[in-house]
């Protein structure tokens, strides 16, 4: 099996991330190519005016931009002259200002009771349907066999009667 060159792999990974971005409508934050320092590296990003993926230089933002990202790290795309925020886990938004809170609440007693009742009713209705289908099928089968017997016995007798 032939292996793909590293540039093809990176291009395919980048295109996959942009396809994912289009599907879930999120902002793609450029990340460094594996093996490079995150302070000064190159990354593949899609330009707004150009549908192709381009390689850009990334550096940390200057010290006067320390407070730009509320919950994340500020990065500067040198070639595009734009700044982006690399958000911490759980934060989203252009400046990492939104906390994505996932709350797991225990189920209420009413919800559990309603679920149990609905499942119980579903099982009773299903059992009733199966029972009536079996009775209908049995009656139909016995009716057919009775008709066969009537057809056989209703004909003229084979032996003469004495």
Swiss-Prot record:
Glycosylated residues, chain numbering: 40
Known function: Ligand of the EGF receptor/EGFR and ERBB4. Stimulates EGFR and ERBB4 tyrosine phosphorylation. Contributes to inflammation, wound healing, tissue repair, and oocyte maturation by regulating angiogenesis and vascular remodeling and by stimulating cell proliferation.
Protein's gene: Ereg
Residue intervals on the Extracellular side: 53-112
Disulfide linkage: 61-74, 69-85, 87-96
GO molecular function terms listed in the Swiss-Prot or TrEMBL record: epidermal growth factor receptor binding; growth factor activity; receptor ligand activity; transmembrane receptor protein tyrosine kinase activator activity
Residue ranges of coiled coil: none
Annotated Gene3D superfamilies: Laminin (2.10.25.10)
Cytoplasmic side: 134-162
Record keywords, A-Z: Angiogenesis, Cell membrane, Developmental protein, Differentiation, Disulfide bond, EGF-like domain, Glycoprotein, Growth factor, Membrane, Mitogen, Secreted, Signal, Transmembrane, Transmembrane helix
Gene Ontology terms: cellular component: extracellular space; plasma membrane
First and last residue of the signal peptide: 1-22
GO biological process terms on file: anatomical structure morphogenesis; angiogenesis; animal organ morphogenesis; cell-cell signaling; cytokine-mediated signaling pathway; epidermal growth factor receptor signaling pathway; ERBB2-EGFR signaling pathway; ERBB2-ERBB4 signaling pathway
The keyword Repressor belongs to this UniProt entry's keyword annotation: no
Keyword presence, ATP-binding: no
All copies of domain EGF-like, residue ranges: 57-97
UniProt name for this protein: Proepiregulin
Subunit-level organization: Interacts with EGFR and ERBB4.
Membrane spanning stretches: 113-133
Propiece residue ranges: 23-55, 102-162
């Amino acid at each position: 099996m032939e292996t793909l060159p590293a540039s093809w792999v990176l291009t395919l990974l980048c295109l996959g991330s942009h396809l994912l971005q289009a599907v879930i409508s999120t902002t793609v934050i450029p990340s460094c190519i594996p093996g490079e320092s995150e302070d000064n590296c190159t990354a593949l990003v899609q330009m707004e005016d150009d549908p192709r993926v381009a390689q850009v230089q990334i550096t940390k933002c200057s010290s006067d931009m320390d407070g730009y990202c509320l919950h994340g790290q500020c990065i500067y795309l040198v070639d595009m002259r734009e700044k982006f925020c690399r958000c911490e886990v759980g934060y989203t938004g252009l400046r990492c200002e939104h906390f994505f809170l996932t709350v797991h609440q225990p189920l209420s007693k009413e919800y559990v009771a309603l679920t149990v009742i609905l499942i119980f009713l579903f099982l009773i209705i299903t059992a009733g349907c199966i029972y009536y289908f079996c009775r209908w099928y049995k009656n139909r089968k016995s009716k057919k066999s009775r008709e066969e017997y009537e057809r056989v016995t209703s004909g003229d007798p084979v032996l003469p009667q004495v």
